[in-house]
Regions:
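Mixed-charge interfacial surface used for oligomerization/domain docking
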Residues: 1-21, 63, 67, 76-96, ...
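Glycine-rich phosphate- or other oxyanion-binding loops that anchor nucleotides, phosphorylated ligands
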Residues: 41-75, 128, 135
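N-terminal glycine-rich anion-binding loop in soluble enzyme alpha/beta folds
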Residues: 1-48, 53
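N-terminal, well-ordered alpha-helical segments
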Residues: 32, 36, 52-59, 82-86, ...
C-alpha cells in the first residue's frame, strides 16, 4: 500500500466481469462485493486491461518520463504483460516490461525493490537485469475451501470439482514456471491450510526469511491467528493482505495463502 501512493507509480487495474458486465478491480468493485457475487452464484470472471487502455496511459506518461518500468502478473495467468508491451509500442513510449512469472504479491515486492534501487541511483538496465533474476526467488502457496470458482475459471474440470467437493478434497497450489499448479491434495480445508502453515513455519525456522505476506479471501481471522503466532515465535514481519477482486474471483472463498521473496544480499 505504501508504494501504491508513490508519485511516480501508475497502476492499471484489471477487470472483473459479473454476468458479462465489466467492473474495474479495486475501483468500481471491492473484494467483499465480488465474494458476495460468487456466493450468489453469479458468473464471475476476469479480463486484462485492453491494449487501448495501456496506450492511453503510456501516451500520457511519455509527456513526463523518458522511460517506464513495468512489472506484470505472470503471462501464464493473464494477457496483461502482452497488452502492456503492445500499448507502449503504439504510444511510442520506451518501456522495460517484466513478466514476473508469479502472482500479484511477490510482484508487488519486486516492484518495491526496483523502486528502492532506482532511488539508490542504480541504472535502469541494471535494475532490469536484477529483477529478471530476482523474480525466480518467490515462494507462494495457497489453498481454497471449495472448488467451484476454480472450475468456473477453467482451472479444473467440472468432474474434478464435483468429486473434490463431494469428498472434501482440497488442493494445495504453488507456482511452477509462471503457472498455478496443484502440488498436493488433502482431505478438508482445515488440513490443507494447516499444511501451508506448517510449511511456512519450516521455512521461518531456517532464520533467513524475515518478511511474509499472508493473503486471504474472507479468512481474516485465520490469517490474523497465523500472524499473531508467527510474530510471537519468530523475528519476522507478517502482513495480511486481502485477495484482490481479480484473484478472489479465481479462488472463491474462503481461501488463504502465503508468499515471500527469498532474502537477497542487496537488502
Amino acid at each position: 500500500d505504501s508504494i501504491s501512493q508513490h508519485e511516480d507509480l501508475t497502476v492499471v487495474p484489471l477487470l472483473v466481469m459479473k454476468d458479462g458486465e465489466s467492473f474495474t478491480d479495486g475501483v468500481d468493485v471491492q473484494a467483499e462485493t465480488v465474494y458476495q457475487w460468487i456466493d450468489a452464484k453469479h458468473k464471475v470472471t476476469t479480463s486484462q486491461p485492453s491494449i487501448g487502455t495501456f496506450t492511453e496511459h503510456y501516451e500520457r506518461l511519455k509527456e513526463q518520463y523518458d522511460i517506464g518500468f513495468a512489472i506484470h502478473l505472470s503471462s501464464e495467468l493473464s494477457g496483461t504483460y502482452n497488452a502492456s508491451v503492445q500499448g507502449a509500442e503504439i504510444a511510442g513510449f520506451r518501456l522495460i516490461a517484466i513478466d514476473s512469472r508469479c502472482g500479484i504479491y511477490p510482484a508487488g515486492q519486486l516492484l518495491a525493490e526496483a523502486m528502492q534501487l532506482a532511488a539508490d541511483g542504480m541504472a535502469v538496465t541494471e535494475i532490469e537485469q536484477y529483477i529478471l533474476e530476482r523474480r525466480f526467488d518467490h515462494h507462494i502457496e495457497f489453498t481454497v475451501a471449495n472448488l467451484d470458482q476454480l472450475q468456473a475459471g477453467g482451472r479444473i474440470s467440472s468432474t474434478k470439482a464435483f468429486v473434490g467437493n463431494l469428498l472434501q478434497l482440497r488442493p494445495l497450489f504453488h507456482f511452477e514456471e509462471g503457472k498455478i499448479v496443484p502440488y498436493q491434495t488433502v482431505r478438508t480445508f482445515k488440513k490443507a491450510h494447516g499444511k501451508i502453515y506448517d510449511h511456512l513455519v519450516e521455512m521461518l525456522e531456517s532464520g533467513t526469511v524475515t518478511d511474509v505476506s499472508l493473503f486471504h479471501a474472507t479468512a481474516y481471522d485465520l490469517a490474523f491467528e497465523w500472524k499473531t503466532n508467527l510474530e510471537k515465535r519468530f523475528d519476522v514481519t507478517v502482513r495480511i493482505d486481502n485477495l484482490t477482486p481479480v484473484l478472489g474471483s479465481h479462488t472463491g472463498n474462503p481461501a488463504i495463502g502465503m508468499s515471500f521473496l527469498n532474502p537477497t544480499s542487496r537488502r
